[in-house]
């Protein structure tokens, strides 16, 4: 019984830590996207495809599907493709619902803007993630100590 409780505690602590790490990984992914747009002067659909090979494996299917959908369904808006694909590929992957919502909502505004506004939209999304990560850090540390 004691070992089960200890095992459960370590499992919960690892899950808490993973939630925080996912926020940092999403932030890293957005920095890559911003860099492709800013310094590579890459159009958004191509930039999404390029960063899909540079991000963590759990986000690669999402990015690759967005890029493929943009290529094959040019009549659909970027926002619609981004949000539908997020529902299909990210909802079950991202543990923290707020990270998922922030990333999903970015698709509403980024697709139809010029390069400068795309960069600012990505930066705003990164700031929202930073705020959420900051709020989570103390809670994760406390919870991890309690679970262990």
Language-model features, listed with the residues they occupy:
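Hydrophobic H-region at the start of alpha-helical membrane spans
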Residues: 1-2, 148
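Generic detector of short, locally flexible boundary/turn motifs and exposed helical patches
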Residues: 9-11, 27, 87-88, 116, ...
